């Protein structure tokens, strides 16, 4: 209760202190570009960004929200984004050990408001992925999101608050959050339909597998809706990266035609097998790996069960067989079609900077695969910069 009461004081003080400066310091030619976007709820194409220099290459006519995971933004980025009706939101996390600390929470919320207002941006994207198994702590996280959402909306009802969540609400990676509460206290959830093999149970021998399968995505969405969460509050997060599993442990049987690659057992949060046995690589690197004529690799194969591509190659240094699981335009399109069929709020990508933008032949179809979510997807022939 103390948090809620003091929130009104936070909002009043921040609003008063920023009202005189909100129109000054605008880096754009037109001051209206420094106002938060006033756009009603809409279908989403959200991009997570970790690189502050790539924005001139984005297809701004396809994006709706850009979640920023770096410290500062270029002035031009703000102007371009708002000119194209794209929200800029700050990716943020929170130390769960302070979830019961009301004074810390009050100060943290004020800092987030000041950050958003001083940068003329549009809200927050919560990316908390810590294990929480105590229902009391899970409820405290919901209360944090609720208090943050109320504080932001009291200043501007068009500020956006979104929450990144695991691909299923079934305590994935011991993230036993109050998902229904998080959904009802935010604009939408981003179900991260990747890293689906972070915990693999029931395998006597650990094996490599798909990073993002439609069957798991569907099961996860159904689990969310079973909690009473509307599909309109769910965004399907998809990967522009894959996993390389080094040294298939198949003995003499390992080769370029290997289908099932046995891997090392690397436990993670209670599971004996996990994708931690592999390493993440961005899509542009995997394309280069496939195109490298000095590396002996198989053709891209297709797993019909997981509806995902993979390939094998001989490591030129060790001579071992490595297996690669990733997503390409074909596998992404299947999941995007699923998102359409389920009437989800939209799609998202981790992360938007994992492409080689100088290679239009391979990068453009990845954009178009996600943009196909929209009934009349915008052409990506040119980025708007």
Curated annotation (Swiss-Prot):
A GO MF term: hydrolase activity, acting on glycosyl bonds
Residue positions with a glycan: 51, 101, 223, 272, 296
Cleaved signal peptide residues: 1-15
Subcellular location: Lysosome
EC number: 3.2.1.-
Active site: 129 (proton donor)
Keyword annotations: Glycoprotein, Glycosidase, Hydrolase, Lysosome, Signal
InterPro entries named in the record: Chitinase_II/V-like_cat (IPR011583), Chitinase_insertion_sf (IPR029070), DIAC_cat (IPR047898), GH18_Domain-Containing (IPR051887), Glyco_hydro18_cat (IPR001223), Glycoside_hydrolase_SF (IPR017853)
Annotated ranges, domain GH18: 16-377
Pfam families, sorted: Glyco_hydro_18
PROSITE patterns: GH18_2
Record's keyword annotation contains Hydrolase: yes
Single GO biological process annotation from the record: oligosaccharide catabolic process
GO cellular component: lysosome
Role this protein plays: Involved in the degradation of asparagine-linked glycoproteins. May hydrolyze of N-acetyl-beta-D-glucosamine (1-4)N-acetylglucosamine chitobiose core from the reducing end of the bond.
Family (UniProt): Belongs to the glycosyl hydrolase 18 family.
Record protein name field: Probable di-N-acetylchitobiase 2
């Amino acid at each position: 209760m103390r948090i809620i009461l003091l929130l009104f004081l936070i909002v009043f003080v921040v609003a008063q202190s920023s009202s005189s400066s909100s129109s000054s310091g605008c880096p754009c030619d037109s001051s209206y570009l420094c106002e938060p976007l006033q756009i009603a709820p809409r279908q989403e194409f959200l991009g997570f960004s970790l690189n502050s220099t790539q924005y001139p290459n984005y297809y701004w006519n396809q994006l709706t929200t850009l979640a920023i995971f770096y410290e500062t933004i270029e002035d031009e980025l703000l102007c371009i984004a708002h000119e194209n009706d794209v929200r800029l939101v700050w990716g943020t996390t929170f130390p769960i050990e302070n979830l019961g600390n009301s004074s810390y929470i009050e100060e943290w919320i004020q800092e987030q408001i000041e950050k958003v207002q001083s940068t003329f941006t549009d809200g927050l994207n919560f990316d908390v992925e810590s294990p929480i198994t105590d229902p009391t702590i899970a409820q405290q996280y919901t209360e944090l999101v609720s208090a943050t959402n109320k504080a932001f909306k009291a200043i501007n009802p068009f500020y956006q608050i979104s929450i990144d969540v695991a691909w299923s609400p079934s305590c994935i990676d011991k993230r036993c959050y109050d998902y229904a509460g998080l959904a009802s206290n935010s604009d939408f959830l981003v179900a991260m339909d990747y890293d689906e093999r972070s915990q693999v149970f029931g395998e006597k021998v650990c094996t490599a597998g798909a990073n993002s399968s439609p069957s798991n995505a569907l099961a996860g969405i159904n689990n969310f809706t079973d909690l009473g969460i509307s599909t309109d509050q769910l965004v399907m997060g998809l990967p522009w990266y894959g996993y390389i599993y080094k040294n298939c442990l198949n003995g003499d049987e390992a080769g370029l035609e290997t289908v099932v690659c046995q891997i090392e057992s690397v436990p993670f949060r209670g599971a004996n097998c996990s994708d931690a046995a592999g390493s993440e690589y961005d899509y542009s690197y995997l394309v280069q790996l496939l195109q490298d004529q000095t590396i002996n690799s198989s053709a891209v194969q297709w797993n019909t069960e997981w509806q995902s591509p993979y390939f094998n190659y001989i490591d030129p240094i060790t001579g071992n067989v490595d297996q690669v699981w990733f997503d390409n335009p074909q596998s992404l399109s299947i999941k995007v079609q699923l998102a359409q069929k389920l009437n989800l709020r939209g799609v998202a990508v981790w992360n938007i900077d994992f492409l080689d933008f100088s290679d239009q032949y391979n990068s453009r179809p990845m954009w178009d695969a996600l943009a196909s979510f929209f009934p009349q997807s915008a052409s990506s022939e040119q980025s708007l910069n």
